[in-house]
């Protein structure tokens, strides 16, 4: 048996918003719980979620995930869920206050980065407070990424 301190925390990533880091400058990240129905959890466990076009919004002091896609669970009966329904996010009051003040700043938005199951089997959402990049910023980050790849190749060849 392994000692207590050496146990790894394994996250099963269900959906990831890969374009978010390219289209947005990430300012801060938060971990939020998601209020889900039973069939939504089963659908998530199948790994068929999509959060590429979704965003989070503040309404009446609560944070909601909007336009995320969790397909219907095929083995469910008539009590299935609506695939694109709004889902409430579970955050502490202090975190909601920080997010609300961040959203009120010009150009800031809340975007989901990934949905995963933590080590307790709970569905969590990694939420980011982000600022949209302009076209020239995207080009600059693409140039930096290409240059870093070239540097890596050059260093690898010189070994």
UniProtKB/Swiss-Prot annotation:
Region (Disordered) location: 136-159
Compartmental location: Cytoplasm
A GO CC annotation given for this chain: cytosol
SUPFAM superfamilies linked to this entry: Small protein B (SmpB) (SSF74982)
InterPro entries, per the entry: SmpB, SsrA-bd_prot, SsrA-bd_prot_CS
Biased composition (Basic and acidic residues): 138-159
Keyword Ribosomal protein: no
GO-annotated biological processes: trans-translation
Chief localization: cytoplasm
One of the Pfam families matching this protein, by short name: SmpB
Coiled coil (UniProt feature): none
GO function term, MF aspect, one: RNA binding
Assigned keywords, A-Z: Cytoplasm, RNA-binding
PROSITE patterns xrefs: SSRP (PS01317)
Keyword Transmembrane listed: no
Family, as annotated: Belongs to the SmpB family.
PANTHER family, alphabetized: SSRA-BINDING PROTEIN (PTHR30308:SF2), TMRNA-BINDING COMPONENT OF TRANS-TRANSLATION TAGGING COMPLEX (PTHR30308)
Described function: Required for rescue of stalled ribosomes mediated by trans-translation. Binds to transfer-messenger RNA (tmRNA), required for stable association of tmRNA with ribosomes. tmRNA and SmpB together mimic tRNA shape, replacing the anticodon stem-loop with SmpB. tmRNA is encoded by the ssrA gene; the 2 termini fold to resemble tRNA(Ala) and it encodes a 'tag peptide', a short internal open reading frame. During trans-translation Ala-aminoacylated tmRNA acts like a tRNA, entering the A-site of stalled ribosomes, displacing the stalled mRNA.
NCBIfam families xrefs: PRK05422.1 (NF003843), smpB (TIGR00086)
Record's protein name: SsrA-binding protein
């Amino acid at each position: 048996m392994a000692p207590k301190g050496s146990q790894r925390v394994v996250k099963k990533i269900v959906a990831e918003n890969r374009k978010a880091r390219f289209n947005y400058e990430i300012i801060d990240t938060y971990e939020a719980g998601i209020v889900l129905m039973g069939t939504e959890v089963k659908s998530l466990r199948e790994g068929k979620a999509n959060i590429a076009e979704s965003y989070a919004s503040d309404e009446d002091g609560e944070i909601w995930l909007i336009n995320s896609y969790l397909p219907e669970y095929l083995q469910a009966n008539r009590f299935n869920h609506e695939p694109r329904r709004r889902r409430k996010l579970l955050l502490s009051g202090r975190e909601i206050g920080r997010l609300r003040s961040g959203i009120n700043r010009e150009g800031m938005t809340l975007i989901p980065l990934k949905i995963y199951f933590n080590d307790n089997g709970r569905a969590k959402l990694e939420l980011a407070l982000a600022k949209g990049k302009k076209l020239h910023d995207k080009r600059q980050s693409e140039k930096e990424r290409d240059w870093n790849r070239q540097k890596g190749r050059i260093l690898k060849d010189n070994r």
